[in-house]
Amino acid sequence: MKTAIFTVVLALAVFAVLSFGWEANEKALSEEFTELIHEKEAASETEARECRYFWGECHDPMPCCDWLVCRYKWPITYNICVWNRTFPEK
C-alpha cells in the first residue's frame, strides 16, 4: 500500500515538473510570436501605400489599386474598393 501511494505521489510530481516546463516553453514561444508580429506591423506602417486595397474606404485623394474600382455598396454608408474583374500585372 505504501508503495502504491509513493508511486502515485512520484508520478504527480513528475507531471507537475513536465507541465511547468511546457508552460515556460509555451510562454517563451508566445512572447517570441508577439515580438515577431510587432516587428511585421512596424515594417508595414513604414511603407507608404500608393492605393487602397480590397474593401478599403476610397475617395478622390486615395484611389483604389489598379484592379479595384471605387463603388458605393449597400448597407455600407461610404464608398469602398471592390474588384473590377481584372487581375494585376506583375
Swiss-Prot record:
Keyword line: Disulfide bond, Ion channel impairing toxin, Knottin, Secreted, Signal, Toxin
Keyword Disulfide bond: yes
Expression (tissue specificity): Expressed by the venom gland.
SUPFAM superfamilies in alphabetical order: omega toxin-like
Major subcellular location class: secreted
GO molecular function, one term: toxin activity
Function of the protein: Ion channel inhibitor.
Name this polypeptide is given: U7-theraphotoxin-Hhn1l
Natural source organism: Cyriopagopus hainanus
